[in-house]
Amino acid sequence: MRLRTIPVLLLVLAASNGLRAQSPDEQFRRANQLYQQGKFAEARDAYGAILAGGYESPDLFYNLGNACYKSGSIPGAILNYERARRLLPGDDDLRHNLQVANMMITDRIEPTPRLFVWDYWDAIKNFLSLSGLTLVAYLFYALVAVAIAVFFLARTYALRKVALLAGSGFLLIFFFLLTVLIARLGDATRTDEAVVMSPIVTVKNSPDPKSSDAFVLHAGVKVQLVDRVGIWSKVRLADGKVGWLEGSSVEVI
């Protein structure tokens, strides 16, 4: 449960709505009160109303996930925990809650093994929040600028050499941080993942209701969206299985 006011990350309201800028914080506090009073379904609806107004933040997704879990909507909990994790991938409480919610679903899907190097890459990407990563990148950008200034203003060869070496190191670190930041932004804005929201879904071998059945999924399973034909979405599971289901049975993370 996150009780602090909403740190809004995305606001998709027109400028003319500026006079109502405080209302999301008030709604957030009200939703928190409902949650603390044990009115979980009402709290879930209150958090959802804030999202419907165009506001997003990791705390909002996290609290909505908690309210969904407490009100018995496990798929909704997983969906919102996953959305929060994109913005706060290193949060231990969030990771724990998502694991608990995933233990409540019917399907157990074991992911295919991957190279250990990708685990290290994920750890590096998720070490800092987006804002923290951006701040550190700006810091090294400033250090590069300082090193360049020192190089051109220095009166001795030794000082110029130090500035050149330091600036080169700072520049390499800056480009590395920029690469990590771009990757994190890509993770946060991707639209190719979804959660099954329908209780039971029969996945087909082709985008046709008369096609043969491939397998069955239950609510709460996370899938990757790889293609779309009309109302049908082609999905891939973590274990590599592929099939087609109606797009209305899933919700994009």
Can you say where each PLM-predicted feature lies in the sequence?
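Boundary regions of SH3-family modules and the immediately adjacent low-complexity/disordered segments
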Residues: 74, 164-198, 206-208, 236-253
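Membrane-embedded alpha-helical segments of integral membrane proteins
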Residues: 113-153
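Beta-loop motif signature
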Residues: 36, 190, 196-225, 229-230, ...
